[in-house]
Amino acid sequence: EGSDKYNHDLIVDNHKYKKIEVKTKRRKYDPRPDWQVSIAKTSKHQNPDLYIFTSITFGRHIGEGRDRIYYEPKSIWITGQMQPKEYFAKARLCQKGKPDPDRRGRTNDFETHVEMYNMNIEDLEPLDVSLLPQKQ
């Protein structure tokens, strides 16, 4: 309600995680456990109860960087979840314009456009299945 509707992707009634923010990465390949999820520092104001991380694998793209446009979605992955306090305590802050190394120090040479808090997919919690629609 009000301005709060711009800070969360989902509102779940009667659940311990009421306000949920979904963070999505677009990819050329299906995600691997040692790949990363990200939250931009500029998104910290959202203050959800839970983050859910997803990846969409696309068949092709044109352009590079911020100008990249993706086509032919092939698959959608729910890669995990985490509560904000735990996420920001464990995540690595990647500076704007620098490659974003994983926790092992490897990089995919992607330079961040803004400061990002990154974490490996393998360090996330699995999705709480009680968040999924239940059969009536």
Functional labels for PLM-detected ranges:
Residues 1-18, 23-136:
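Nucleic-acid endonuclease domains
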